[in-house]
Regions:
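Glycine/serine-rich anion-binding loops at beta->alpha junctions
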Residues: 113, 130-146, 228
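Metal-dependent amide/peptide-bond hydrolase catalytic core
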Residues: 2-3, 26-28, 83, 210, ...
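Acidic/histidine-rich catalytic neighborhood of metal-dependent amide-processing enzymes
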Residues: 140-217, 424-425
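Acidic/His- and Gly-rich active-site-bordering loop/insert found
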Residues: 2-4, 20-135, 156-161, 378
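Residue-level signal for inorganic ion chemistry
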Residues: 49, 53, 202, 242, ...
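Ser/Thr/Pro-rich, intrinsically disordered low-complexity segments
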Residues: 6-15
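Acidic-glycine-rich active-site phosphate/pyrophosphate-binding loop
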Residues: 112-128, 195, 210-222, 349, ...
Length: 425
């Protein structure tokens, strides 16, 4: 398939004294740092990360982490690699600073499977105009590259921050969240450090996202008793019992939709998959249902399942030979950061000064690892990154704007300089 070649949008390098809408002017240090962030270096690192693949499910993030680690080490960052499972390492890379609170960046190394139908090899990155194409370009190899090169520019400019700037890159974000769970577990009870804020570099099209819903996967198992369909009363039909539970779930979904949050919408249920029975002429002895529950900030999947199980008992669905069990196989909490938080104001201002125009403040329909940082460590969290979640992430011929990559890196650098600050001479 032939693509029309978009016209690249030049991003002028900001200079000292630049102001946007009355925002604070860029300092000489800020301008010097931003001038060291180049399009060529961002395209090169993003391309290398795309080529490393890391499809998941499959657990193949190791090569991506190796490429990322090599880039961080080449720039002199302190690094730590911890295997969550064989060949599946979390990476922590830090630009050291003083003892003041630092700034945390969060990303993930895995990508969803490429699938079929690509115009070119999904793991051989290519560029057409302003678009860099390849699986993970938007979600989220570009965001990772932008973080690394933002911190590298600060170091190259001989700026010492008052506190650390740290990148945590986890595995398995696209599936069960093994990486972020291992991180939060290993960090207890001391925590992960003193950070003024966390910036998740997922694709937001340079929008400042201050909250997102969480997500939970729930597996429902119903056990009954098989019998000949000519005498169904001799058996206990697991599919029939499961259908009654599904009716409870759908009723709760309707209840949730009646209470819409202006930023995030509402929690929701989705029945994603059903398996049950062994034959048309047999009473179904078993049924399994896979369920997705989108969580509002503060909701807990285990509490939700406990309430549903109580309804099942109240309706006597799990009686007379029917056994019902629920299992939460994955939970990712939602979060919300106040619109007046310092990281929000700083991100909006930095985006304008970095050449990205106005960054609107909004919510996010997807879930991400940032909810764990907010819930487990109480760190104010936003999502801000290059790429279009709705039209590029997880899509055939996924691509990202090179212009957005450059702007995102500049914003990340400005956030370090402004939220953490320079160390005293």
């Amino acid at each position: 398939m032939t693509r029309p070649a978009p016209v690249p949008v030049p991003v002028p390098v900001p200079v000292p004294g630049d102001t946007i809408r009355g925002d604070t002017a860029l300092s000489e240090t800020e301008s010097r740092v931003l001038s060291l962030i180049t399009e060529e270096s961002i395209v090169e690192l993003t391309s290398a990360l795309i080529a490393a693949a890391g499809e998941n499910p499959g657990g193949t993030e190791g090569e991506t982490v190796s490429v990322l680690h090599a880039a961080c080490a080449a720039h002199g960052f302190a690094t730590d690699i911890t295997d969550v499972a064989p060949g599946r390492p979390n990476l922590v890379a830090t630009l050291p600073g003083g003892s003041a609170p630092g700034l945390l960046f969060l990303g993930h190394s895995d990508v969803v499977p490429a699938g079929e139908g690509w115009s070119l090899d999904p793991f051989t990155p290519s560029r057409t105009g302003d678009r860099l194409i390849g699986r993970g370009a938007t979600d989220m190899k570009g965001g990772l590259a932008a973080i690394v090169l933002a911190l590298a520019a600060i170091k190259e400019a001989d700026v010492t921050l008052a506190g650390p700037a740290t990148l945590i890159c986890t595995v398995d974000e696209e599936d069960l969240g093994l990486g972020i769970r291992a991180l939060t577990k290993s960090a207890q009870p001391e925590g992960i450090g003193d950070f003024t804020a966390c910036v998740v570099a997922e694709p937001t099209d340079l929008q400042t996202v201050i909250g997102c819903r969480g997500d939970a996967y729930i597996e429902l198992t119903v056990q009954g008793r098989s019998a000949h369909s000519g005498r169904p009363s001799d058996g206990r039909n697991a599919i029939s019992a499961a259908s009654k539970i599904i009716a409870l779930i759908l009723a709760d979904h309707a209840r949730l939709q009646a209470n819409q949050d202006a930023l995030l919408g509402a929690g929701s249920w989705n029945i994603g998959r059903i398996e049950g029975g062994d034959g048309t002429s047999m009473v179904a002895a078993d049924c399994r249902v896979w369920i997705d529950r989108r969580l509002m900030p503060g909701e807990n999947a285990h509490e939700i399942v406990a309430a549903l199980a109580a309804q099942v008992r109240h309706e006597k669905i799990d009686s007379d030979g029917i056994v019902v069990t629920f299992e939460v196989t994955m939970e990712m909490p939602g979060f919300r950061t106040g619109a007046q938080s310092s990281v929000v104001a700083a991100t909006v201002a930095a985006t304008a000064q970095a050449g990205g125009g106005e960054s609107t403040i909004g919510g996010w329909s997807a879930a991400c690892d940032g909810g764990f940082i907010d819930r487990e460590f109480g760190i104010p969290t936003i999502v801000f990154g290059p790429g279009d979640l709705n039209h590029q992430a997880h899509q055939i011929d996924e691509s990202v704007s090179v212009t957005e990559l450059v702007v995102a890196a500049r914003v990340y650098a400005l956030l370090c300089l402004r939220l953490v600050g320079e160390a005293a001479a």
